[in-house]
């Protein structure tokens, strides 16, 4: 899937082709071959929540996407539901909150800050940094998807989150602290247009039906392990760095 919001604002076309046409192509293939299908999606299809709102996203929350990326994912979710109902495709859907951990593309928020600091560049924080994300370690996400594939009910949607709400300012300050810098040693840059304020997942359906539970519940230690991974695996991300930063620089970010 195409999954980076900033890229969808620069050029929405690949998101339509990959996330919508790509999902249609896969659905037709599984319909033809009569195989089980699991569709991985995002909590961004639900739009956003107010910072002081106690509510969380639930499987029944109405869709309200706000970007080309989230709109393309919402459309792909609806295609899956239609193929289940219209053609009897055996499929499930999961909508997950923000991931972190090893092997994440360095255009993403956390690895970008880590690799900038490795390069001696101050982290960049969009706007005031008040936007809240519900962080989950990628290995917990993987475990949840496997549980859904093995035990999930056909046609159902499961929300994946680990109760890891933190605003972007808190995350940047923790990265700085863990990497030996003053917690205020970052730059404020222009905010993303239409930047969603808060995401939060109600994972009770996943927990109660399938017995899933996150293993990486300490964000600080998970983030430290992630920092260590990027330090130890520069050969993996280094070839991507210049191009990623050039794209951000063109937008003043």
Question: Would you name each region that the model predicts?
Answer:
Residues 117-253:
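C-terminal substrate-binding subdomain of Rossmann-fold SDR/epimerase-dehydratase oxidoreductases
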Residues 20-28, 107, 139-142, 146:
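Conserved active-site region of classical short-chain dehydrogenase/reductase
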Residues 65-72, 96, 102, 106-110, ...:
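The catalytic Tyr-centered alpha-helix of NAD(P)H-dependent dehydrogenases
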């Amino acid at each position: 899937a195409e999954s980076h919001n900033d890229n969808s604002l620069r050029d929405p076309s690949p998101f339509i082709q990959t996330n919508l046409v790509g999902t249609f192509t896969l659905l037709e293939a599984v319909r033809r071959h009569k195989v089980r299908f699991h569709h991985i999606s995002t909590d961004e299809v639900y739009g956003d929540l107010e910072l002081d709102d106690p509510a969380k996203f639930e499987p029944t929350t109405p869709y309200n996407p706000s970007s080309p990326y989230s709109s393309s994912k919402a459309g792909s979710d609806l295609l899956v539901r239609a193929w289940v109902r219209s053609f009897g495709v055996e499929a499930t859907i999961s909508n997950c909150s923000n991931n972190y951990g090893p092997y994440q593309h360095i255009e993403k928020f956390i690895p970008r800050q880590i690799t900038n600091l490795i390069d001696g560049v101050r982290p960049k924080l969009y706007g005031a940094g008040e936007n809240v994300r519900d962080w989950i370690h990628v290995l917990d996400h993987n475990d949840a998807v496997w549980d859904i594939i093995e035990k999930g009910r056909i046609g159902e949607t499961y929300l994946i989150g680990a109760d890891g709400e933190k605003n972007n300012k808190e995350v940047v300050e923790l990265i700085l602290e863990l990497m030996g810098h003053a917690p205020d040693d970052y730059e404020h840059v222009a905010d993303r247009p239409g930047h969603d304020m808060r995401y939060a997942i109600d994972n009770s359906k996943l927990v109660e039906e399938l017995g899933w539970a996150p293993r990486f519940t300490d964000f600080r230690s998970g983030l430290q392990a992630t920092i260590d991974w990027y330090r130890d695996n520069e050969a993996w991300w280094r070839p991507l760095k210049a191009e990623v930063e050039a794209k951000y620089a063109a937008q003043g970010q």
